[in-house]
Amino acid sequence: MAELATIARPYADALYKAQGSDLATTALWVDKLAAVAGNAQLLQFADSPKVSVDQVFDVVAGVASNANDPLPEAARNFLRLVIENGRLSALPEIASQFRSLKNAAGGMTDAVVFSAFPMDEQALNDIAAVLEKRFGRKLGIKVELDPSLIGGIRAVVGDEVLDTSVKARLEQMKMALIA
C-alpha cells in the first residue's frame, strides 16, 4: 500500500498543479476514472501482454464516458499517460491523493461514516455537524453501510477514528469482563 501511495503521489501532484483552475470538474472525472480502474477484471485485461496500450485506453475511456457525458480532453490525456506508464492500478490511489490535495486547499477533510443502517439526509446533516465540531474542520462525508456494527456509527476522519458503535461497546465490555 505504501508503495502504491509513493507511485501515485507525483501523478496526483502534477494533476493538481495542471488543473488548478478547475479542481471541482477534475475531481469528478478523476473519481470516475478511478472507479473504472478499480475493477479487478479490467486490471487483469490491462496486464495481458496480448492487449495494446490503445486497446486498454479505448476500453477504459469507453466505460468512463458516455454520449451524454464524454471525458474532457485533459482526462483523456491524463488517462493515456497513466496507461502508457503502466500505472492503471494506481489510479484509485491517485484519485484519493488528488482529493486530499483539493480538500486541503479548500480547508476540508474527507470523512467516512460507517453505519449499520441507511441514514436519511437529516440524520447525516446532524452527524456532519457534530463531527465537524468534534474534529474542528469542514468535512466531506461519505456514508458506507456496515451491518456488523449492529448499531451506532464509526467515523474515520483522516487517521482518526471515532467509534460509537454497539460492536465497539460490546468489545469494551468483553475486555473489561476478561481483565
UniProtKB/Swiss-Prot annotation:
Keyword vocabulary terms for this entry: ATP synthesis, Cell inner membrane, Cell membrane, CF(1), Hydrogen ion transport, Ion transport, Membrane, Transport
Subcellular location as annotated: Cell inner membrane
Example of a GO MF term: proton-transporting ATP synthase activity, rotational mechanism
GO cellular component, one term: plasma membrane
UniProt keyword annotation of Cell inner membrane present: yes
InterPro entries: ATP_synth_OSCP/delta_N_sf, ATPase_OSCP/dsu
Keyword Ion transport recorded: yes
Membrane topology: Peripheral membrane protein
Main subcellular location: membrane
Similarity comment: family membership: Belongs to the ATPase delta chain family.
Subunit structure, interactors included: F-type ATPases have 2 components, F(1) - the catalytic core - and F(0) - the membrane proton channel. F(1) has five subunits: alpha(3), beta(3), gamma(1), delta(1), epsilon(1). F(0) has three main subunits: a(1), b(2) and c(10-14). The alpha and beta chains form an alternating ring which encloses part of the gamma chain. F(1) is attached to F(0) by a central stalk formed by the gamma and epsilon chains, while a peripheral stalk is formed by the delta and b chains.
Protein purpose: F(1)F(0) ATP synthase produces ATP from ADP in the presence of a proton or sodium gradient. F-type ATPases consist of two structural domains, F(1) containing the extramembraneous catalytic core and F(0) containing the membrane proton channel, linked together by a central stalk and a peripheral stalk. During catalysis, ATP synthesis in the catalytic domain of F(1) is coupled via a rotary mechanism of the central stalk subunits to proton translocation.
UniProt-listed NCBIfam families: ATP_synt_delta, PRK05758.2-2
Protein name: ATP synthase subunit delta
Species: Polaromonas naphthalenivorans (strain CJ2)
Gene expressing this chain: atpH
